[in-house]
């Protein structure tokens, strides 16, 4: 009986090893085939977030809705997105395109016609490039895409990408119109700032009770002028004046640097005894980058002297 058990265990082990070895050989053959015999272009989400988002969205148009199994609840409604896997789509101009979605990457393949000789592979690679160019020209325009970054330690995180929302002009309040007029003057007078030797940036303090439209106004500014948003958290891990200045210096020109609920953030800093972040450090950070709109949001209908001083210095 013992001998039979040993034989069974040994056979099972050999079977598992054979299965693993066969699986590795299959993967090696598959990788060799796709890497050397197919036209191939790889798109990394961390390096090309806009293009990755655009092609993934385009791919979702061709895929049956039953395959949209990944849930995204960032927003007012739940959205079902594409899960990782292998897909194929048929385009009118570029024929069949195969897409492998894995590990935050999209790997696009195109099968060469007739033969696998280099000229055919090059031809199909060019067709892949034309497909990517067409998606980029349509879906990656400033008026079609907004990037929203959040601070993560001493870096800006992978962006949240959104399609611009449309706002009815009739829904704008008098105060909102006043702010938009101010931003419009700022955006149209860069040359005037330069001629006067003034720093080209604009600081705004939006204040009011929660739900009065401060965040919505930031979205309107972002959409109207094609500006990406950078959300700064003063209480993130390892935050200090030097990290604050480094983050601000890495914000791209023609963007909005936002500090939401600055009153609550400063209260939290004081409550935690955080002495690494100071008002002086905040002002120094905001004093550096050019071509930005700085927006501080304060959740109260009354601004005290302290916040008025910050507004004046901005």
From Swiss-Prot:
Q: Tell me one GO molecular function of this protein.
A: ATP hydrolysis activity
Q: Which InterPro entries match?
A: ATPase_AAA_core, Mitochondrial_chaperone_BCS1, P-loop_NTPase
Domain of life according to the entry: Viruses
SUPFAM superfamilies listed in its UniProt record: P-loop containing nucleoside triphosphate hydrolases (SSF52540)
SS bond list: none
Short name of any one Pfam family annotated for the protein: AAA
Q: What protein name applies here?
A: Uncharacterized protein R776
Origin organism of this chain?
Answer: Acanthamoeba polyphaga mimivirus
């Amino acid at each position: 009986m013992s001998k039979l058990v040993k034989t069974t265990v040994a056979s099972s082990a050999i079977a598992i090893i054979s299965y693993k070895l066969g699986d590795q050989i299959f993967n090696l053959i598959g990788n060799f085939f796709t890497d050397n015999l197919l036209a191939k272009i790889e798109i990394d989400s961390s390096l090309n977030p806009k293009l990755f988002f655009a092609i993934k969205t385009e791919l979702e148009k061709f895929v049956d809705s039953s395959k949209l199994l990944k849930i995204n609840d960032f927003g007012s409604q739940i959205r079902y997105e594409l899960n990782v896997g292998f897909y194929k789509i048929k385009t009118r101009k570029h024929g069949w395109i195969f897409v492998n979605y894995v590990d935050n990457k999209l790997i696009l393949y195109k099968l060469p016609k007739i033969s696998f000789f280099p000229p055919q592979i090059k031809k199909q690679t060019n067709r892949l490039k034309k497909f990517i160019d067409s998606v980029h020209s349509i879906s990656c325009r400033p008026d079609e895409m907004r990037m929203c970054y959040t601070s993560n330690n001493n870096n800006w995180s992978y962006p949240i990408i959104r399609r611009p929302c449309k706002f009815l002009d009739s829904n704008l309040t008098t105060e909102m119109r006043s702010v938009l007029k101010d931003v419009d003057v700022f955006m149209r007078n860069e040359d005037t700032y330069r001629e006067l030797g003034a720093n080209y940036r604009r600081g705004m303090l939006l204040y009011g009770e929660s739900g009065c439209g401060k965040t919505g106004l930031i979205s309107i500014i972002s959409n109207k002028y094609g500006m990406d948003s950078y959300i700064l958290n003063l209480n993130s891990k390892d935050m200090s004046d030097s990290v604050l200045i480094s983050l601000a210096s890495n914000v791209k020109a023609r963007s909005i640097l936002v500090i939401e609920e600055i009153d609550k953030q400063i209260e939290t800093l004081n409550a935690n005894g955080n002495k690494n972040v100071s008002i002086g450090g905040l002002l120094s950070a905001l004093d550096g980058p050019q071509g930005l709109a700085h927006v501080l949001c304060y959740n109260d209908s009354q601004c005290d002297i302290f916040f008025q001083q910050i507004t004046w210095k901005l």
